[in-house]
Amino acid sequence: MPSVGPGQPMQRAAEVAWLGGAERVRRRRRRQLENAKMNWAVTRIGGRFHYGWLAAAVVFLILLAAAGTRATPSVLMVPLERELGWSRAAISLAISVNIALYGLTGPFAAAAMQRFGLRPTILTALVTMSAGVALSSMMTQSWQMVVIWGLMVGCSTGVVALTLSATFVTRWFHARRGLVMGILTASTATGQLVFLPMLAAIAQRHGWRPVVLVVAVAAAIVIPLVAFLLPERPADVQLRPYGEPADAPPAPDATKENPLAVAFRTLLTASRSRDFWLLFFSFFICGASTNGYVGTHLIAMCSDYGMTEVQGASLLAAMGVFDLFGTTLSGWLSDRYDNRVLLFWYYGLRGLSLIYLPHAFGIDFFGLPLFAMFYGLDWIATVPPTVRLATDVFGKAAAPVVFGWIVAGHQLGAAFAALGAGLLRASLGTYTIASMISGGLCIFGALIVLRINRGPSRAAAQAA
């Protein structure tokens, strides 16, 4: 063996230190290059326009793609039942797994965004979502739908969902938070408006496989926009959050803790607050009465009454038009009025609409349009007031992760309703009982939101 000189260990240590320093320099230069690109975009925009509005537009498109993906199973239900012979209960099982994981991913996604950054987390989710949807075109067995749509698509869409909206809004906006949250939440309605009639028409003419390929391509198109136009924070482009005073303290640095530890520690602290459980269970009811029941089963329900998939999808799209207006208005109202009172009216009107739904099919002209208008106006209008209440109670720093857990309740409710309504339809041959149960839950939710009291819960959270 060659001899080792006395100076060689020190020389190797120096080489290792030099290589480590060079790697740090390369990373710093890469960050500077990314920030320079963002600064160029800000310079090109110029004037009084705050870059946060452009970043919000990018987030809107992300949520739009996720909404289109989330709405796709409702279009696939009847074609899969006809072509592959799967039962509606089996398809509902896959959808319920998707919905549950969509919600349970939220708090961990919020913690991951704090630890690893918005862009890496979002890009990973979009790639997984696009690949999973494309892979589903080769499904032949119902268990494959559970794995692909339930696991892969459920987790990836959960990352780019309401938790992303809450994280982005708290980072980029000091003023107009309710309005921006309302606009971003309305992306779900816009996704239905853009995707559902088109996807239903494709499914009716060409089958269900081209549908999933179109959705996969739509999700992939958003990826470069995220890579080049979405900064991590306003400070990365030498800006403050929109509307923040000049003397406000700087935002805290990103946490280096394990996202799992952050998510569970936040849950432990928040769960000691009564307000957390009131928000959690009210959002459980929200999910059961929207994504779980109407979002999953309305097209199939219309088919039971002799309507085509395109007609059912068009009804959902019409509801999306009203929801686009209602949710944006809800965001504006949440900046100005008591959010508990807003939630009382939203849940109450939704409950009455769902109780009316089974009777709407028997009214020739005004039945379904009347339901679409009243139900659509507050379909997701509950989100801006809920986010505002969570931020007021738990503070700006903890709000995204806390809201992630509240969204988990939303999606657990949705999964419960998606599976439960499918089982009721399979055993009774009708959705009437499911509509009545869903409407009754909403009226109960309207009552419990009035019990939210910020003072004691804030004190409890701080004491913890």
Residue ranges and their predicted role:
Residues L80-E81, A112-M113, V194, M198-H206, ...:
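Interfacial helix-cap and linker-helix signal at transmembrane-aqueous boundaries
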Residues L64, G132, Q144-V159, F284, ...:
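Hydrophobic core of transmembrane alpha-helices in multi-pass small-molecule transporters
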Residues S187-A235:
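Helix-loop-helix hairpin linking two adjacent transmembrane segments in secondary transporters
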